[in-house]
Amino acid sequence: LRAGRREGRALFDYRRADFPFAMRTVARLRAAVDEAQHGRGVALVKGLPRDALTADEFELLTWAIGLHLGVARPQDRQTRYINAVKDVGVDYRSPTGRGYSSRAELDFHADSGDIVMLTCYNQAPAGGDSLVSSGVTAWRALASERPDLAHALQTRPVPFSRQGEQGEGEAQFTQVTVFARTDTDVFCAWNRNRIVNGMKLEGAPPVDDAQREGVE
């Protein structure tokens, strides 16, 4: 990592070739991606060299790992690609709240990237636990127990609030179905906080009883 690091160099100026990880490290990362995409849906990689790195170096390590996994996508209107999970007093339930800037217990939700990476530099004094659930399992349970609600959430879009991060000329919300399917895969676009906030926005299309019950 330090061999590839250049003082003052922006993250976007780095390339995968700047960080020639050992083959065993690359294999471990690729196995984690495969597990996340085609296995349990989540993978835990331990042993990152936190004690040997400064906070800036650890951020660069996170970026370097990402370069070996895919193409980074922005997380917010400010086009930040790496965000610190830190309580800065944000109200998670507000129309513009983001969970990573609050101390709230977050709802289960599915982020929009193909792979989401969370690295830990500082252990939280209290809390900070992560829970993982399966959108595929949720779909199977809903389709088995309430096929009417599963059908509603698969075929009729619900409003998703943009949490105040819409671009100029864009609506405050977008519309997506909670579930989508192909012949082999199930996709889940679940974020209850954004859906509930989206339902309250002016101009948002009304949802029917089945959609509302499915969300609840």
For each of these PLM feature ranges, what is it?
Residues 56-63, 133-134:
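"Short basic amphipathic alpha-helical interaction patches in structured regions
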